[in-house]
Regions:
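Amphipathic, well-ordered alpha-helical segments in soluble domains
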Residues: 3, 7, 28-31, 35, ...
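Long, charge-patterned amphipathic alpha-helical coiled-coil/hairpin "stalk" segments used as oligomerization
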Residues: 92-148, 152-154
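A structural signal for long alpha-helical coiled-coils and helix-turn connectors
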Residues: 40, 132-135, 158, 185
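Long, charged all-alpha helical bundle/coiled-coil segments in cytosolic proteins
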Residues: 52-111
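Long amphipathic all-alpha helical oligomerization modules
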Residues: 143-213
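Extended alpha-helical coiled-coil scaffold domains characteristic of the BAR superfamily
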Residues: 29, 81-95, 99, 117-121, ...
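Leu/Val/Ala/Ile-rich N-terminal alpha-helices, chiefly Sec-type signal peptides and the beginnings
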Residues: 1-69
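Non-transmembrane, amphipathic alpha-helical segments
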Residues: 17-28, 40-43, 47-50, 73-83, ...
Length: 213
């Protein structure tokens, strides 16, 4: 057997191993993203038990990815794992912010810093949805806290003005957070103003009825 035959066998074996790891990690990443999306939908429906269960399953999926790619770090940074980590960080923060008014740290979520920040940017969109749900249910005042969180998220993301090669598209997340902030501030301001008008009309009606009686 020539040296080239030996080389080809060993290199092909290496690439076969890497390809199998990539396929498994890709499958797991898609599953993590699906679980996180389902978890967030459960939160908006008020099914917190299901949301927690789905997040735990997603966490297990991320751990499996780390094991599968332990010896293939080049595949780890191909991009698809980042998407899974971002979705997980988003789901964890949406749950924590809406149920406990607590923003989790990167260490709490266990994902890489840049993926944590990207997930936080996406969190602003889910917080906008939560605020709109509060407005529809006649509780606009509760939305002020969450609007403040969106603003803090935007201010945080604006600090990371680094090349895209380092932040992996974080600028787009900053733009998203700014859009969510501006639109939601307008919606909430209108809802609060309407609530004040309705309260004034109710007081006027009560006063008028009291005078009649």
């Amino acid at each position: 057997m020539s040296i080239f035959e030996n080389l080809s066998e060993s290199m092909l074996a290496s690439f076969d191993s890497k390809d199998r790891a990539r396929e498994e990690a890709l499958r797991l990443s898609r599953e993590v993203i699906r679980l996180c999306s389902s978890s967030i939908r459960s939160m908006h429906r008020g099914d917190l038990e299901a949301a927690e269960r789905l997040m735990k399953e997603a966490a297990l999926g991320l751990e499996k990815i780390r094991v599968v790619l332990k010896d293939h770090q080049d595949v780890r940074y191909a991009g698809f794992v980042d998407g899974a980590e971002q979705e997980y960080a988003e789901a964890r923060n949406v749950y924590s912010i809406t149920t406990r008014h607590e923003v989790l740290t990167p260490e709490d979520t266990g994902v890489e810093l840049v993926n944590y920040l990207a997930g936080l940017g996406d969190t602003s969109g889910e917080l906008r949805r939560h605020i709109l749900d509060l407005i529809r249910s006649g509780r606009p005042l509760e939305g002020e806290y969450f609007l403040g969180v969106i603003e803090e998220i935007y201010c945080l993301l604006m600090l990371f003005d680094y090349p895209d090669a380092l932040t992996r598209g974080l600028r787009r997340k900053s733009d998203l957070a700014r859009s969510m902030l501006e639109r939601t501030r307008g919606d909430l301001t209108n809802a609060l103003a309407l609530a004040k008008v309705e309260a004034s009309l109710l007081r006027f009606s009560d006063t008028a009825n009291a005078k009649k009686s």
